[in-house]
Amino acid sequence: MSTPKPDARTRLLDAGMQLLRERGYDATRVEDLCTAAGVTKGAFFHHFASKADYGVAAAQHWTDTTAPMFAAADYHAAPTPLARIFAYLDLRRAMIAGAPAQFSCVAGMMAQEVFETQPAISDACGASIAGHAATLEADFAAAIAEHGLGDVVHAADLALH
């Protein structure tokens, strides 16, 4: 039995995960996305009012597709908060192999490119990044408390950076 093909919107968003990392937001044309997704330009505009709307959706799609991988990652099994933080950093280090387009963060890349020109995309990327950082805050807070550093650093700040 064959696996059902994702709908056109999902195929467009999936195509963007690679194209946006290879070319950047500005250099990725609607036509390129359509070709990669195997859909027409009309299908693109059926699902997205503009390329900017696509950019906002792409940031959310990045979150939706990467969050389960991070949630299931082995670093959560480390025995202490500090060990989990170091295991997370080890995971991130292991992820940065090969060409940048293979491992770079779509939200981070787009945020850097469009922060002055596309506020809606910039905000969506910021929400994606902050949302991921929030998943690390509890371990940072516990490690800070465990090591008596509460007056020196803040969990949310460390998680975001």
Protein language model features and the residues they cover:
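Short, charged helix-capping/linker segments at alpha-helix termini
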Residues: 26-27, 148-156
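Helix-turn-helix
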Residues: 11, 15-53, 57
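Hydrophobic alpha-helical connector segments
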Residues: 57, 71-103, 155-161
